[in-house]
């Protein structure tokens, strides 16, 4: 309800009479730029295997992810003199599904018999701090490049609905990324933009792990929008979120051999707003 209220309130600014920013004083050295998206997430592909003897599990075909999920994205950007961009992102991702095991399933050392009613949770929230330098400073357009540090907060649960069997995995780790973004003007108060952050890391420490696990991530979008009044912009956004990891951790949890394979491709469609 609060997200809907914020979006409606922002769109209502189209009827305002002033063109000055609603939140930033004219000529300020530092300016604040909130960004919010709400929409739907569609898993396109999603595979996972936990343990060398574990099942190569298809979340979409066998795990109930053949559906649409709610999507939200929260960002706050600070700009110094319009050139230095410092951003903070909260990206929730918590996919919970229920189905029955169509065949015997094994995750690490836990085995679920065929036809077991199952509950799955794939939680992969991430938090990101980004610095970018704008090469189009002094114009209404932006073209920025920089680096980011992302913190993954993963929670993977596989359990029987009767509570007798469960496999759970937790992981928190840093992931360095390269980042880019742009925003370009069109006619009649229209604009389009993009953002992207990603990395490919086959080497330990670079991928936020202490072992040679291959990891990759790409979070990229393209959007089109309208300039409203008082520095508000509304837009429609198409986003791709993909990546994963494969390898063996040399310090596994007790009862596990440390092997993990996890690759996914998600697409989101959202509407949103931001303030200049």
Summary of predicted features, one role per range:
Residues 156, 191, 272-274:
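Membrane translocator/pore-forming domains, dominated by Gram-negative outer-membrane beta-barrels
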Residues 13-93, 268-276:
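Short glycine/proline- and aromatic-enriched beta-strand/turn motifs that initiate or cap beta-hairpins
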Residues 36, 74-80, 129-133, 147-151, ...:
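Residues on the lipid-exposed face of transmembrane beta-strands in outer-membrane beta-barrel proteins
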Residues 44-69, 92-125, 151-173, 201-214, ...:
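Extracellular/periplasm-exposed beta-strand and loop segments of Gram-negative cell-envelope proteins
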Residues 172-187, 195-203, 209-210, 216-218:
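A contiguous pocket-lining binding segment that forms or flanks enzyme active sites
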Residues 33-39, 87-91, 144-150, 195-199, ...:
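Transmembrane beta-strands of outer-membrane beta-barrel proteins
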Residues 2-12:
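Bacterial N-terminal signal peptides
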Residues 83-86, 139-143, 188-192, 230-234:
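Repeated loop/turn-to-beta-strand initiation elements of outer-membrane beta-barrel proteins
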């Amino acid at each position: 309800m609060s997200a809907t209220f914020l979006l409606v309130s922002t769109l209502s600014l189209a009827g305002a009479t002033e063109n000055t920013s609603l939140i930033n004083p004219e000529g300020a050295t530092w300016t604040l730029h909130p960004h919010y998206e709400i929409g739907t997430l569609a898993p396109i592909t999603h595979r996972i295997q936990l343990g060398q003897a574990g099942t190569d599990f298809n979340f979409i075909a066998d795990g109930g992810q053949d559906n649409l999920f709610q999507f939200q994205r929260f960002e706050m950007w600070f700009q110094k003199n319009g050139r230095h961009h410092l951003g903070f992102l909260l990206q929730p991702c918590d996919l919970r599904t229920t189905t029955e095991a169509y065949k015997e399933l094994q995750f690490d050392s836990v085995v679920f018999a065929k036809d077991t009613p199952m509950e799955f949770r794939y939680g992969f929230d991430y938090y990101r701090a980004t610095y970018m330098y704008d090469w189009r400073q002094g114009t209404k357009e932006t073209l920025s490049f920089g680096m980011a540090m992302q913190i993954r907060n993963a929670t993977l649960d596989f359990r029987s609905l009767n509570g007798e069997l469960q496999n759970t995995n937790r992981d928190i780790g840093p992931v360095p990324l390269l980042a880019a973004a742009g925003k370009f003007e069109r006619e009649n108060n229209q604009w389009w933009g993009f953002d992207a952050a990603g990395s490919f890391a086959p080497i330990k420490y670079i991928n936020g792990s202490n072992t040679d696990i291959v990891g990759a991530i790409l979070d990229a979008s393209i959007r089109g929008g309208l300039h409203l009044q008082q520095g508000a912009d509304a837009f429609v956004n198409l986003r791709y979120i993909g990546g994963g990891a494969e390898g063996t951790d040399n310090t596994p949890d007790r009862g596990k051999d440390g092997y993990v394979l996890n690759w996914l491709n998600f697409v989101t469609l959202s509407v949103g707003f931001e303030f200049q």
